[in-house]
């Protein structure tokens, strides 16, 4: 395989970095009136302004050269054609098949997967229609008013994010609840809000053996039966997203209400699959299909557009520039829309679980940085929390500012204030404020010279802080589909360039294995096992505390 450090463009970019690292965006804008026009892209209902980055035409040219040398176009084609690019698990990677609205064949191991994708989608639609229309009745012949999704990781983060983002499109009768944490308090809080007669539980676990999910599911089942009494009532109030038909049936769920997905769908890429059943229940089949349409639009742009005008590719390459050359170890997601407040958490899993890897596809140490730490918060709240660090801290931290052009509320003045802040922050991060500008401002306030000079260093902003401004014309299912697909493909492209597998997650496994051993010790089912002195002490502290 091609190793990043051996690519000619990798070295050329280091030389270019040495020559260009002192350039300031403020001056680049002053010298080039067409800068914003050149570094601007529109795809469907999304607009990307990437002009406020530490880049020029040479930077982008060399980054595109790097992408070609790393084999990005070929790897993209392999994914779309069903090749087993998840080499450590010997699996295809085909979340794009789930939103393949052209229905053109996508073949894995000699089988076109589209018929079974469409079959599950149709079954989801029929089930959602029954629940939403009120024809699906609980054990007391009442309609469903609450849906509780029990899952973890990709079985939770994606559906929760999308249902929250698209709340204005949700069914007015349905209240959506999501349970992922096994600590008990989250499930207890949800159960205190719902009624067994009108609640539908969705248990989302591919194997139906995930410890956290099954623990919560069994507790929910016990709570339900304490009220319903009759085991047969479970079938009216529980559905499953799984491939383990036997375990689902043993749980008491009617397998007619089991919705499958496949090993070529990774958890963090699965909201388009049956894992998205809560989304379809809440938004309806038509809006779910619109979400798929938006993702498909981005897929087609991604696979058919030259790298030089390819939105996910450009975002990926700019990220590479900061991570591998500037040493930017983190990346902020700041949506300026309260309904998008779950988006940073979703992208955090997407990026960090995909690209938080230390070895290349051939098992060698990477020798360079990979995934940054992804974090964030809604933009307005962030401005009053951590934007101080972004403006005047010592780290180079790229920021994605995400907003909608169309108002989401009829409250006068709110949206204009919101967008004014988005645009102002992007400008402030780029321009900064020079010492002379600070002096002039303070002098105009009548401040004496000595006090001015004391304050100048504190009120100066260096600027040159990078941002991507991502605008949706409106927040709707189609544009949300495009937005999430864009981030998926960005993550994939960065993984290609780093030479890593973006589609496994072996780092999740070690802690699970050790937890099984320790659980036996905490419950008394097994004797003491050999651990380090710290872990032994922690186990003993728990046992002593709970003997009292």
Curated annotation (Swiss-Prot):
Q: Which residues form a coiled coil?
A: none
Residue numbers annotated as active site: 353, 384, 512
Q: Which UniProt keywords apply?
A: Cytoplasm, Gluconeogenesis, Glycolysis, Isomerase
Q: What is its EC number?
A: 5.3.1.9
- Where does it live in the cell? Cytoplasm
- Give GO MF terms, alphabetically: carbohydrate derivative binding; glucose-6-phosphate isomerase activity; monosaccharide binding
Q: What class of enzyme is it?
A: isomerase
Q: In which pathway does it act?
A: Carbohydrate biosynthesis; gluconeogenesis; Carbohydrate degradation; glycolysis; D-glyceraldehyde 3-phosphate and glycerone phosphate from D-glucose: step 2/4
Alphabetical GO biological process terms: gluconeogenesis; glucose 6-phosphate metabolic process; glycolytic process
One Pfam family name from the record? PGI
Catalytic activity line of the entry: alpha-D-glucose 6-phosphate = beta-D-fructose 6-phosphate
Q: What is its main location?
A: cytoplasm
Listed GO CC annotations: cytosol
What the protein does?
Catalyzes the reversible isomerization of glucose-6-phosphate to fructose-6-phosphate.
Q: Which family does it belong to?
A: Belongs to the GPI family.
Protein name per the record: Glucose-6-phosphate isomerase 1
Gene source species: Neisseria meningitidis serogroup A / serotype 4A (strain DSM 15465 / Z2491)
């Amino acid at each position: 395989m091609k190793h990043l450090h051996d690519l000619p463009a990798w070295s050329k970019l280091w030389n270019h970095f040495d020559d260009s690292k002192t350039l300031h965006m403020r001056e680049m804008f002053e010298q080039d009136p067409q800068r914003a026009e050149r570094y601007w892209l529109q795809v469907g209902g999304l607009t990307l302004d990437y002009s406020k980055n530490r880049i020029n035409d040479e930077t982008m040219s060399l980054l595109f050269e790097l992408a070609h040398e790393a084999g990005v176009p070929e790897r993209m084609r392999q994914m779309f054609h069903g090749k087993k690019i998840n080499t450590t698990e010997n699996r295809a990677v085909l979340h794009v098949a789930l939103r393949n609205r052209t229905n053109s064949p996508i073949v894995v191991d000699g089988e076109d997967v589209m018929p079974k994708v469409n079959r599950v989608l149709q079954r989801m639609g029929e089930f959602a229609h029954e629940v939403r229309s009120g024809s699906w009745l609980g054990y007391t012949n009442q309609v469903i008013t609450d849906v509780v999704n029990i899952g973890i990781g990709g079985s939770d983060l994606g559906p929760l994010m999308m249902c929250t983002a698209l709340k204005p499109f949700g069914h007015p009768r349905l209240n959506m609840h999501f349970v992922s944490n096994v600590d008990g308090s989250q499930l207890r809080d949800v159960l205190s809000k719902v009624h067994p007669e009108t609640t539908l539980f969705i248990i989302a676990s591919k194997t139906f053996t995930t410890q956290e999910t099954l623990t919560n599911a069994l507790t929910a089942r016990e709570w339900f039966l304490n009220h319903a009494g009759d085991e047969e009532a479970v079938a009216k109030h529980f559905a499953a997203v799984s491939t383990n038909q036997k375990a689902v049936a043993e749980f008491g769920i009617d397998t007619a209400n089991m919705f499958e997905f496949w090993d070529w769908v990774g958890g963090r890429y699965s909201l388009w699959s049956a894992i998205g059943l809560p989304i379809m229940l809440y938004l309806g089949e038509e809006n779910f299909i619109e979400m798929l349409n938006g993702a498909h639009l981005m897929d087609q742009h991604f696979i058919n557009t030259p790298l030089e005008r390819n939105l996910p590719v450009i975002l990926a390459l700019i990220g590479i520039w900061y991570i591998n050359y500037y040493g930017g170890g983190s990346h902020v997601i700041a949506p300026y829309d309260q309904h998008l407040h779950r988006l940073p958490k979703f992208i955090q899993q997407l990026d960090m679980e995909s690209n938080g890897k230390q070895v290349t596809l051939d098992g060698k140490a990477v020798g360079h940085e990979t995934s940054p730490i992804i974090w964030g918060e809604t933009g307005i709240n962030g401005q009053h929390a951590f934007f101080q660090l972004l403006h005047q801290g010592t780290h180079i931290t790229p920021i994605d500012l995400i907003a909608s052009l169309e108002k989401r509320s009829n409250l006068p003045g709110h949206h204009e204030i919101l967008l004014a802040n988005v645009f102002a922050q992007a400008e402030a991060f780029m321009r900064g404020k020079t010492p002379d500008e600070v002096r002039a401002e303070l002098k105009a306030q009548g401040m004496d010279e000595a006090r001015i000079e004391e304050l100048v260093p504190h009120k100066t902003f260096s600027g040159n802080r990078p941002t991507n401004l991502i605008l949706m014309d409106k927040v709707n299912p189609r544009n949300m589909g495009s937005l999430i697909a864009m981030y998926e493909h960005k993550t994939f492209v960065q993984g290609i360039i780093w030479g890593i597998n973006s589609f496994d997650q072996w780092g999740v496994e070690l802690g699970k294995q050790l937890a099984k051993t320790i659980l036996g010790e905490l419950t008394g089912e097994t004797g003491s096992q050999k651990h380090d002195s710290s872990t032994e002490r922690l186990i003993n502290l728990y046992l002593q505390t709970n003997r009292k």
